[in-house]
Amino acid sequence: MLATTTSVDTPDDDLDLALEWAKINLEEQRVCNPDLGCGFVAGWGTSGTSFRPGFGWFFGGDAAMNTLAMDVTGQWDLVAEDLRFLARYQRDDGKIPHEVSQAAAHLDWFEAFPYPYYHADTTPWWMTAVWQYWKASGDEDFLREIWPAFIRAWEWCLSVETDGDGIIENTTGGLAAVEVGEIGAGVHQDVYLASVWTAALHGVPDMARAVGDTAVEARAVALRDLARGTLNEAYWSSDRGFHAFALLRSGGTNDDLTVCPAAGLMFGLFDEGPAEGTLRHLAADEVSTDWGARMLSSSSDLYDPLQYNSGTVWPFVTGFVSLGQYRYRRPWSGLHLMDAVKQMTFDWSLGRHPELLSGAFYTPLDETVPHQFFASSMLPTPLIRGLVGWEPDAPNAAATLAPQIPADWDRMAVRRLWVGDTRVEAVIEREAGVTRVILGSEGPPIELAYVASLPLGSRNATVRVDGEAHAVEAESSPHDLRLPVELTLEGAEHRIEIEWTGGLSVVPPRIGLEPGQTSSGLRIVNFDREDGAWRLSVEGEGGRSYRVRLIGQPVTIQKTVFSSEGADRTSAGARVAYQQDDVTDLELRLPAEETMRRLMTVYLE
């Protein structure tokens, strides 16, 4: 398996190895029950004298999330098998099972117990998983085989959308973001469920078109646009600057800052401006600790670092936030979260990832399982889909490769990227002002969009493909300059060389985790330009000094601004500690009298 699936070779050997462990873990979730068939269980733990061994039952939502990783590592046979398994236990009305006991064949599991179908999000997750598997593999035979079950799932979702806003509801469909805790009180529809359903809707038109179901295609297009509009408008809190948690049965909103909007951010479903606001809040320590993302902000009155849904750190949503940061071109906020999941590979049960951890200390909770598969999947998901930027589109014989490599990496090789029957290999090398890319393939021809990410403020960019000048149209974003290079891969090796002048990148901080530690690391909250100056916003502990490395043209500090009690004040809190060639190290000093975490913005020119 390891020799036929996606691997990376980067300057971070632990990251390369952690990906191999994650793929092994995702193979280990497969269980064959002689009475029920073969599918994915959620995790393993000790059973004691009378309990199940951790989450050793079949869990539909967990499995569907995990397929997002397996689609881009090439572990397709297991994905197709599990999607069929879940369809086998689909309820008559189309709802996909949340959990199936290993003893389900020996008791009245599906009728006498409330657990099999009590989650609403499992069905749109399964629909999304079918879509993503088809996009990666191009398996049209599977799509036609599963389509009757897919249509039943689609019709169930339509039956629980009752208020006309295009989004299915918790009140009619079941649980989604939370299972326990006051945070779920009075919820009519939460942003997590709304996001997963809207993501599923984005795949329905293409699949319906592929199987010739024109009626479903037309309905899905209209519903997709309606749902996305609701998601963007109903949940945005302009006063607070981030997306709310839920719409309430009372007609109001629950405006708590939670990790849940990341379910939409990871699919790029939110408009760019509001998404930036939410991503900045999620990047700060109130959600993103040194070791991962809390379910609920530490500033909430409901926050409890030991409570299941109200403050613990979950690796699976950590991956959601990491991928969301990459999706909106914010790699300096996404890397440390992915890196935390990487370090968990080696800090607890070797090669495994715990279910959840304390929101206050870097330690798993005693009552949770040490080997949870949707935690393991959230290393390859942000790594391959985010940092590497791989998006296969096998039905159209196409793919996108849009890497966002850390600014201090000089190379990266990616082996065995799969799109349908085509294997793609990529080697990327960088030095000051130059990126060189070698691309190769084996299998049927594909159209590849290679999207280079150049430092913010870059100028005079040129592209050569196989030694010949290649015209491209640069695309500016708030955080980088993108150069899309279109080419056909059909076996022969292709070389891309990109040159530019100027520009500046920030190196994401690395945080070496120690079991039991509290959260004290630096966060890059934002990096953009304003009035010709680069603007670097960081968050750290008062009284602490931090180092941040910049790579690109030499810069000087224009001014430094602190945010304190809602009022900004200018203060000399930053200095250039080192500068040579294209490297500038900043020393950032937060005032000693401010012992809480504070936001600091440095303007550079």
Residue ranges and their predicted role:
Residues 17-22, 74-88, 140-158, 204, ...:
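Extended, well-ordered alpha-helical scaffold segments
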Residues 1-54, 135, 140-145, 154-156, ...:
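Acidic/polar, glycine-enriched structural segments that form the non-catalytic walls/loops
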Residues 65, 203, 260-263, 320:
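A general alpha-helix detector
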Residues 129, 194-209, 222-228, 323:
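Extended, hydrophobic/aromatic-rich amphipathic alpha-helical segments that build helical scaffolds
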Residues 285, 320, 324-569:
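Non-catalytic C-terminal accessory modules of carbohydrate-active enzymes
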Residues 17-68, 72, 526-605:
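Conserved, compact domain cores that house catalytic/ligand-binding motifs in diverse enzymes
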